[in-house]
Structures are given as C-alpha cells and as structure tokens.
Amino acid sequence: MSQSNLTSTPQLRTMFPDYWRINSLVRAEVSELDDAVLDWTSDRWGWSVWSIRQQTSHMASVPVRWLIGKWADQLFSDKLPMSPERYSTFDSTEHDRRLDDRLFWHIEEILNAVDEAIYISKRVLVDTTIHKARSMFVCRAPSDQWNLMRTVHPDGISLDPKTGQMTCKDLVATFRHIQNEFYTHIFNIQRAKLALGIEPIVKLPDAGYHKAVGWDSKVPIWNEAR
C-alpha cells in the first residue's frame, strides 16, 4: 500500500492502542493470586457475584463471542481464526458468557485464552481501516443494561429497523465495547481485591462502562469483606 493510501485510510488500530497492552493489565492483576482469592464471591455487592476467576474467564470470551460469534461473516469470509470446536469452548453453553470451566480452570489457562482472544482482536485492528469499520454494522438484542452501556459511546451506535431501538453498532463501537468490558471487569477485580485487603496493581484509564452515570461504581472499604 502506498504512503498516501496509508495516510488516507489509517488502520483501525490507531484508534485502539490499548489492545497492545490490555491483556497484560489483566495478567498483572490476577496471576499471583491464590485459589481462595480467585474464587471468592459474595452476595453483598452485585459485582461480587462473579469471582475473579469468572471475571477473567468472561474477558477471554468477550472478544471471541463478538468478533467471531457476531462479525464472522463480515470479517472472516475466507477462514475463521479458530475452529468451530475451539469457538465452542470460548462461548460455552453451560457457562454464562465465559469459557468452558472444564477446559479452562487454572488461571494460567484462562490468561492464555485472554492472550488468544486479544491476538485475534489485534489481527482485525491491523487488517481493517477506520473507513471500512465505520461502514460495517451488527445488531444486538435490546436490554436495560445496554441502554445504560450505550451512554458511554460517543458514536457508532445506530437504530435497529427491526426493533426501533438503538442497538446496532459499527465495528469501531464494537471494539470500544470490548475494551470497555475489559476495563470494567478489571475494575471489578480491583474492587474484589480491595474488599479482601489486597492492593490493586494497575492504573486503569478513565474509561469503561463503570463510568456510566447510574452504574454501581462504588469502591469497597479496604478489607471490608474479611
């Protein structure tokens, strides 16, 4: 591609540089935790119903479920980046929006799956121009949670003619959605660690669904769950 074409049609990666470090943020927060911490849950807060292990598993699943589960026909017309059998382990029918626990239980296995999902994401970010990403759309089912989540999207969200609701997103908004999911679930992991008296490791950017007005983003008191 000529230099003029590179200038006029920049890669989508230029909008999302954090994809080149986001899996390392996850790894930094969870890799040294023992099983008691990884599997701690509480019904005291809505965000603590899922354990740190489950939050991490969910993050590994999100990019794959979106980029392959919803975008495959537009992004991977020639060959999918993983087999259908492999995909089914990232979108387990027996585990809610996360990896198959039977195959991904040890935290290092889950983190390797996060790496795999982000690798696929980066391939798309490099192979797709911003112009093309703005011309592509998929739609999701309407929900009360999505009505709150979409308020943090400055653009890329449009009307679904079938439902009359703002539930369609272009590829830019999809990558922003995945990134917001990561930020918010890392934030949840940090909240769990604070509640257990463990210092968080990474500094998150000022972004994520937990920044939406109306989202429960209250941080627990240090060691509050002990």
Question: For the regions a protein language model found, what residue spans apply to each?
Answer:
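Short, helix-capping/interhelical loops that line the mouth of catalytic, cofactor-
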Residues: 1-17, 62-134, 194-226
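Generic structural signal for well-ordered, non-transmembrane alpha-helical segments
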Residues: 17-20, 24, 57-60, 112-115, ...
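A hydrophobic membrane-anchoring alpha-helix module
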Residues: 175-197
